[in-house]
Curated annotation (Swiss-Prot):
Name assigned to this protein: UPF0502 protein Ajs_3392
Family to which this protein belongs: Belongs to the UPF0502 family.
Highest taxon above the source species: Bacteria
Bridged cysteine pairs (disulfide): none
HAMAP family documented for this protein: UPF0502 (MF_01584)
PANTHER family: UPF0502 PROTEIN YCEH
Length: 225
């Protein structure tokens, strides 16, 4: 049975954990699947996150356990340290392109189709805005037997040129609160978006280096400092 957010919506920690696994599988594939520590750092990073969260290790572990019950994440064995990967595309029943858009909406909040195309650059390269809109329309028109719509188009906020899209994985969206968030100046211009991408790229490089060190420590049987 496909995932149905109408009957069992994700909690905020679950959405952050799931979206972070989606992101890292695409941006730092050499470090993926993720250890609990790497996942915690990704969930709480300050760039490319809206809102910024401060989850604890126990909260992330609880979210993983709950997501595993829904077969949305998988624990990978065979290593000294447990690693985790998402099972989003199969568990929710969407293609990779749609998974990228949903992951971005979970991590960054409501966005226009144009913002999604820019922010998805390191996840999936959409040919143009029309291709983004085509996948969004498909997600919005999902039939009830497939779990119902997964995104909604919000009313255009006062002063905004374009309406924003929001995900429904955590249940119905309060349009008034979403409009208030979209009215804030943080990270909405193209220049800010480009800067955020550069910061994200640097953070991903650091994460990849840490993962390499951790793997070497596991192979050598020494503790990481």
């Amino acid at each position: 049975m496909p995932f149905d957010a109408r009957t069992r919506p994700l909690t905020a920690p679950q959405a952050r954990v799931l979206a972070t696994l989606l992101e890292k599988s695409r941006t730092v594939p050499d470090s993926y699947p993720l250890t609990l520590n790497s996942l915690l750092a990704g969930c709480n990073q300050k760039s490319s996150r809206d809102p910024v969260m401060q989850l604890t290790e126990s909260e992330v572990q609880q979210a993983l356990d709950e997501l595993r019950q829904q077969t949305l994440v998988l624990e990978i064995g065979g290593a000294r340290v447990a690693r985790w990967e998402h099972n989003f595309t199969r568990g929710v029943g969407v293609p990779d392109q749609s998974a990228a858009l949903l992951g971005l909406l979970m991590l960054r909040g409501p966005q226009t189709a144009g913002e999604l195309r820019i922010n998805a650059e390191r996840w999936h390269r959409f040919a143009d805005i029309s291709s983004v809109e085509a996948f969004l329309d498909e997600l919005q028109s999902r039939s009830d037997d497939k779990g119902g719509p997964l995104v909604t188009l919000l009313p255009r906020a006062p002063g905004a040129r374009e309406p924003r899209w929001a995900h429904l994985l955590c249940g119905p969206v309060d349009a008034s609160l979403a409009q208030m968030a979209s009215a804030s100046p943080a990270s909405r211009s193209e220049e800010d978006g480009a800067l955020a991408q550069r910061v994200q790229a640097l953070e991903d490089e650091v994460a990849a280096l840490r993962a390499t060190v951790q793997r070497l420590c596991e192979q050598l049987g020494v503790a990481e400092h």
